[in-house]
């Protein structure tokens, strides 16, 4: 069950993380 919400949240977090990384750079 933990992997289920982790996989769905991972997709959203991955997009937000990409923006944060570009801002940090």
From Swiss-Prot:
One Gene Ontology MF term: structural constituent of ribosome
Disulfide pattern: none
Cellular compartments per GO CC: ribonucleoprotein complex; ribosome
Segments of this protein annotated with the region Disordered: 1-25
One GO biological process term: translation
Keywords: Ribonucleoprotein, Ribosomal protein
Pfam family, one: Ribosomal_L41
Domain of life from the UniProt record: Eukaryota
Keyword Ribosomal protein: yes
Extra facts: Initially thought to be part of the large ribosomal subunit. Crystal structures show eS32/eL41 to be a small ribosomal subunit forming a bridge at the interface of the 2 subunits.
Subunit and interaction comment: Component of the large ribosomal subunit.
Similarity field: Belongs to the eukaryotic ribosomal protein eS32 family.
Protein name per Swiss-Prot or TrEMBL: Small ribosomal subunit protein eS32
Lineage: Eukaryota, Fungi, Dikarya, Basidiomycota, Agaricomycotina
Gene behind this protein: rpl41
